[in-house]
Amino acid sequence: ITLNLYAYLASWGMLRNSFLMQKDYLFSKPVVKILCKDKYSNLISFNPFKENIITDLETIMSLRDEIKEYYMGQTYIEDGTNKTKTISNVTDTLITKIILGTLGCVPAYDQYFVKALRRNKINGVFNLNSMKQIIQYAKDNKEEIEKACNKLGNLYTPMKIIDMYFWEVGIEK
C-alpha cells in the first residue's frame, strides 16, 4: 500500500520540489498505518449528504493533524547541498491528496481547487470551517453530484466529484 501511495503522489506531481523527493516510498509507511487505524475506518464510506456530519468532519480533522504531526520534524537531505533539513511545513495540498487518494473523503486543496473555492466565497484553508462550507455546497448540489457519480459508474466518491468540478473552475482564466 505504501508503494501505491508513493506512486499516486508522484503521478500528481507531489514529489517535485518536496521533501518526499529525497525519501523512498517507505518513508510514508507510518502515514499508511495512521490511515488504517480503526478510528478512521468509517471515512472510507464518507457520505457528505447525511445529517449530523460534524463527527465525521472532526474525525477528518484529527486525521489531518496526525498526518501532519508525523511529517513535521522529520529530516531529509537537501538536494544539491547535502545538508540535513527538518520538515517545517506540510501543505494542505499534500495532506488532502493523501486523504483523497486513499479514503476519498476530502477534495484535494491544490492551487486550482483553492482558487475556485475563493471565487465561490468558500474558505480555502483545509480546516473544519472550510469542510462545513464544502459539505453545504455538496448538499445544495446533491442531485448534480449524484448524477455525475452515477454517470461515472460510481467509480468516484462525491468528494472526488467536487474536487474535479472545483479544479476545472479554478483552472479557467
Labelled PLM ranges:
Residues 95-97:
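Cytochrome P450 catalytic-core helices
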Residues 100:
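C-terminal substrate/ligand-recognition segments
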Residues 1-86, 104-173:
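An N-terminal alpha-helical hairpin/helix-loop-helix interaction module that forms a charged
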